Amino acid sequence: MSDPAQVLRDFAPTKEFFVGIDSDGCVFDSMEIKHQECFAPMFIKHYALQATSKYAREVWTFVNLYSKTRGCNRFHAVIHALDLLRTHKEVQARGVKVPSFPALLDWVERESKLGNATLDAEVASGNEALVP
């Protein structure tokens, strides 16, 4: 399988500057469909929010597409969405227990490079609270 990043590593500059455009959600209107059809359903499934799926989808979409937090790191988005969902009156009325993850919040607050590699390293270092 070819390495898609190899094109950039092999790139030979012909000018003293480079203009790059992140097309995901900027050039192409692809963010809504990704969040509504993929990320929101996985958020609901992963955190067992089926009993409140309508509101979980609403909150996820708001956090990631329509609020001041649009474009935030995915770990921040999960925390924001769960926190907001926990305060939603319809969710509270249904008695749905929305999970909280203090270990994730702690890690997000102290880690400067939020990504899968640093999360894996944190788990490997013994932070069992982050193990799914």
Spell out what each predicted region is.
Residues M1-I21:
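Non-catalytic pre-domain segments flanking phosphatase-related domains
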Residues T14, C26-P132:
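Alpha-helical substrate-recognition element adjacent to the catalytic core
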